[in-house]
């Protein structure tokens, strides 16, 4: 039985990368999870750099046939990765990397000293392959490794967070009578991911209602604050603009609480310009659970969301007020919801993701 060693970031904390890794590791490919699994998985959790030496010893002692490595997009993390690459090279180990983001090439070409840049080009060239999240992100590794060794495996929606067909039917039926539509922000609270933009949309809604209009939207936020300054900004903006009746913060959600939010909300907003962005799983989850998408033409997002087809895809010239007005005038939510649901079930379900990864592990 083929042995595969995961060198990756496992939860906690939970984010797009760790979620994808956990889904794959706990899949039916793993013989410890499923007796019919085709592979023996082992893991080296590189989330905590304090375990660096211990992790190097684990890697050096591993008898795995293939090392599956989710690489970093920071200079410090990359130094760790270079040491791991060198160790695998010295031991003549096969290594397949998976980039869960879109910033790596910019990091290497623009942010690194010459020696570190050269070390990356040299290390990547010797790999068995490099996986990216979408077609438009293949350019990240072009010129670093042979084109036929650059592969695409899109993210997926975990089965546990995908509403059933019956639940979607009920959601569509309820839409006919919904006077106030819920807009969902579900991500980590990082300024460049765009949560201030969504707060501005909430402010625009309040101003319209104050001028005599009926309330049309309520804004639901969920996710983790990594910095106290982000939490202060969020809470201060709500208080200063009197948005208490327009904004609800649900904290960090998971399990049934998350499913209920996905069921309740009809619009998903992630106007991100986050430098490390790849292909946000949260957007796929929203589409799969029957939501109209508001996002940007950033990183690998245009590969999954098309303006006017799946929602609103904004360039850098858009502002929150213009986006809000466009949403206000959108009267075909039903069609977007049905279209987005079909797309995810066909191309981005958990089984499809695992099937693609199985093919690479077998090769």
Label each residue range with its predicted role.
Residues 5-7, 168-203, 220:
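Conserved donor-binding/catalytic core segment of Leloir-type glycosyltransferases
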Residues 331-362:
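A charged, aromatic-enriched C-terminal amphipathic alpha-helix characteristic of glycosyltransferases
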Residues 186, 217-233, 251-252:
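Glycosyltransferase donor-sugar binding loop
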Residues 231-253:
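Nucleotide-activated donor-binding/catalytic signature segment of Leloir-type glycosyltransferases, i.e.
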């Amino acid at each position: 039985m083929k042995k595969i060693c995961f060198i990756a970031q496992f939860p906690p904390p939970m984010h797009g990368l760790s979620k994808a890794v956990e889904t794959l590791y706990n899949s039916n490919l793993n013989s410890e999870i499923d007796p019919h699994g085709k592979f023996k998985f082992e893991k080296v959790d590189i989330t905590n750099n304090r375990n660096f030496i211990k992790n190097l010893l684990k890697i050096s002692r591993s008898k795995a046939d293939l090392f599956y490595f989710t690489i970093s997009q920071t200079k410090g993390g990359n130094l760790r990765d270079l040491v791991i690459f060198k160790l695998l090279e010295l031991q003549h180990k096969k290594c397949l990397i998976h980039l869960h983001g879109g910033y790596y090439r910019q990091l290497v070409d623009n942010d690194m000293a010459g020696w570190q840049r050269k070390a990356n080009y040299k290390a990547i060239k010797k790999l068995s392959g490099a996986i990216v999240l979408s077609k438009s992100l293949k350019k990240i590794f072009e010129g670093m490794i042979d084109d036929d060794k650059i592969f695409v495996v899109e993210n997926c929606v975990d089965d546990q967070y995908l509403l059933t067909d019956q639940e979607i039917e009920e959601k569509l039926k309820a839409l006919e009578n919904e006077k106030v539509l819920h807009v969902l922000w579900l991500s980590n609270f990082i300024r460049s991911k765009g949560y201030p933009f969504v707060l501005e949309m909430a402010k625009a809604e309040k101003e319209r209602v104050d001028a005599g209009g009926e309330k049309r939207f309520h804004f639901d936020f969920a996710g983790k604050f990594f910095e106290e300054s982000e939490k202060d900004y969020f809470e201060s903006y709500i208080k200063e603009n009197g948005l208490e009746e327009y904004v609800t913060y649900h904290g960090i959600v998971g399990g049934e609480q998350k499913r209920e939010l996905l069921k309740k909300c009809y619009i998903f907003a992630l106007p991100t310009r986050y430098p490390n962005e790849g292909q946000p799983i949260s957007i796929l989850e929203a589409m799969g659970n029957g939501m109209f998408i508001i996002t940007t033409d950033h990183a690998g997002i245009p590969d999954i969301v098309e303006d006017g087809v799946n929602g609103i895809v904004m360039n850098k010239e858009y502002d929150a007020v213009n986006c809000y007005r466009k949403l206000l005038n959108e009267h075909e939510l039903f069609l977007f919801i049905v279209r987005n649901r079909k797309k995810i079930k066909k191309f981005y379900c958990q089984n499809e993701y695992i099937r693609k990864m199985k093919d690479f592990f077998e090769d």
